[in-house]
Amino acid sequence: MAINTPLTNSWLDEFPARIAELDRAHLRRRRRVVVPEDGAHLQVDGQRMLAFCSNDYLGLAGHPALVQAACDGARAFGVGAAASPLVSGHSAANEALEAALARFVGQPRALYFYAGYATNIGIVPALVGKGDAIFSDALNHACLIDGARLSSAQIHRYPHADLAALEQELISSPARRKLIISDAVFSMDGDVADVPALLALCERHDALLLLDDAHGFGVLGPQGRGCLAHFGLSGENASPRVLYMATLGKAAGVAGAFVAGSEALVEWLLQKTRSYIFATAAPALLATALQTSLQLIEQDEWRREHLQRLIARLRSGLAQGLQGSSWRLGESPTAIQPVVIGPNDAALAVMEGLRTRGLWVPAIRPPTVAEGTARLRIALSAAHTEADIDRLVQALTELAKPGSL
């Protein structure tokens, strides 16, 4: 057969039809070209928008001090690590950042990764494997789910935040090694896990707790030190049964992620995490920017105070504005404020209605959320103003009225 002879009935011919099916189900996703502007504004496909979609919770991503620190790091170290951390990619800046991160979250040791998703899909298989057991909250982020699948351990998926059901699963499992994995702040609902209760279960059933604090680091706890500090479980009260993970591209405003825990746990992960061992290290310029970010997170309490006022203002406004509507505002104390619309097409219509008003709020649809719970995921930032919140509340109040869409 000639190399260029076209095949008939190839499975490769299925992709156009499969993409069309995504369109029919209102599930096709499209990237938008964005350019950051002042405050919480973006240019989205050339249109200036007030954005409520970024995880830049403290408004640090464009901070001049971080930009300067990154430039200084680039001049000192170049723009690429050019090797994995275990070869020659572990810079002095990355080493200093790991020490700073461990101190910041009150844990003995930290390990810095280039991305959050890569962290979780790597550390879970490094901790447990065939014959072991993982207990996963039903609403965990995809990276925890994928890490569990890659581990080959038996996966027990318990109903969201149902710790009684979790304990029954722990009791029933014959596995010697048990790993509980949970978001600390759930990314699509904004609620906070009951970390003390999860830790108590670990102590009763000889389990390890892996907490993904992607959306709590920098925001929760004294000086933004995260969910463990929020619950008084860091520093002198740190437990060897907790492995803490957080990302550095959200409230910290830069990129990357880290894990923190006991010396032995972190050393094991350094030795066995494939997504760490076989990947090029994060550029040192990011580490220099992150050290500056940690200083700002610690000292700028006004950012968290302002954010809390915005959360309260939004919730108060929507509690009134959505009265009589079928839409539901989720019970969230954090910067993630979900408005559950229901059908995919309805959520997209609301998103479009906001876009025509100069507001950018993405519609989140399956498989990110369950069928029938398509929603607006409103993400608030210290970069927003009270006037920004009022503008969003007014727009949603108008769109929630019958016949407005």
Swiss-Prot record:
Belongs to the class-II pyridoxal-phosphate-dependent aminotransferase family. BioF subfamily. It is an enzyme of class 2 (transferase). Keywords: Biotin biosynthesis, Pyridoxal phosphate, Transferase. It catalyses: 6-carboxyhexanoyl-[ACP] + L-alanine + H(+) = (8S)-8-amino-7-oxononanoate + holo-[ACP] + CO2. Pathway: Cofactor biosynthesis; biotin biosynthesis. Pfam families: Aminotran_1_2. This is 8-amino-7-oxononanoate synthase 1. The gene is bioF1. InterPro entries: Aminotransferase_I/II_large (IPR004839), AON_synthase_class-II (IPR050087), AONS_Archaea/Proteobacteria (IPR004723), AONS_Proteobacteria (IPR022834), PyrdxlP-dep_Trfase (IPR015424), PyrdxlP-dep_Trfase_major (IPR015421), PyrdxlP-dep_Trfase_small (IPR015422). It comes from the Bacteria. Catalyzes the decarboxylative condensation of pimeloyl-[acyl-carrier protein] and L-alanine to produce 8-amino-7-oxononanoate (AON), [acyl-carrier protein], and carbon dioxide. The keyword Transferase applies. Substrate binds at residues 29, 141, 368. Pyridoxal 5'-phosphate binds at residues 116-117, 187, 215, 247. The keyword RNA-binding does not apply. Its cofactor is pyridoxal 5'-phosphate. GO terms for molecular function: 8-amino-7-oxononanoate synthase activity; pyridoxal phosphate binding. It comes from Polaromonas sp. (strain JS666 / ATCC BAA-500). GO terms for biological process: biotin biosynthetic process.
